[in-house]
Amino acid sequence: MLVSAKEMLNKAKAGHYAVGQFNINNLEWTKSILLAAEETRSPVILGVSEGAGKYMTGYKTVVGMVNGMLEELNISVPVALHLDHGSYEGCYKCIEAGFSSIMFDGSHYPIEENIEKTKELVKVAKGKGMSIEAEVGSIGGEEGGVIGRGECADPKECKSVADLGVTMLAAGIGNIHGKYPENWEGLSFETLDAIQQLTGDMPLVLHGGTGIPDDMIKKAISLGVAKINVNTECQIAFAEATRKYIEDGKDLEGKGFDPRKLLAPGAEAIKDMVITKIKLFGSEGKADE
């Protein structure tokens, strides 16, 4: 059964570890992430961008697939299904479809409008027992068609959004989606620390987890980050393993062209990547505590 992300993130914040949000794109992605979480006894958040939701034919399809897998695979760790970088309209669609968590990305609105819309969605989400994430300061790079520069959020604006009753807060601290350029200046821990001082127990979210050095990830967790989003690294691992299978001519051997065989190395690579991240974030074994 899907759960809100609230309890798992509050526990993570108090226990100084982070729960991974791993974005799903299809059946293989979903299965690999769920199996990795079950194997490591870690809570997990399945992220769905609006683009991925559309690709999978709609949010109801996603909910049906995820709920079916939780049952068929006997998944016993806490799993939240979360809309990633949701538009105002997208949030309502996911609430209706049966998601257990949403993110409203109002970072491109003026702060007053962002606050107004967030306030409204907080009320609706809470009424349905769902968790809700808000964002202040855009995250750089591109995610599901949403493009951001990678700025640092204003800690005071973060506090005003946190005070609206959101479950978790994503704040730009110089992080970007996708691969980090060589001239990237790194995360602004000064900004993160200032945000944590003002937002207290609020679980903070780090978007663009791919390519951030491990020591920076650990430092971010020590400064209140309780949810870390990973997408690009899983995509790269999948692509590399699939390319190797084809380049090695495996698809030409026997029934190697069968999609179940052709996609298996990529699915295994995703699972391995998720296990590595779960261990790095410190959430291994936390489902049983």
Predicted features and spans:
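Short catalytic-loop micro-motif centered on adjacent basic/acidic residues
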Residues: 19-23, 81-82, 103, 204-207, ...
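Extended, intrinsically disordered, low-complexity segments
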Residues: 246-289
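Metal-dependent phosphohydrolase cores
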Residues: 21, 213, 259
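Glycine-rich nucleotide/cofactor/substrate-binding loop typically near the N-terminus or early
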Residues: 81-83, 240, 249
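Alpha/beta enzyme core
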Residues: 3-11, 15, 27-52, 57-76, ...
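Active-site proximal loops enriched in glycine and acidic residues that flank catalytic Cys/His/Asp
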Residues: 173, 208-210, 232
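Hydrophobic alpha-helical scaffolding
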Residues: 23, 151, 228, 232, ...
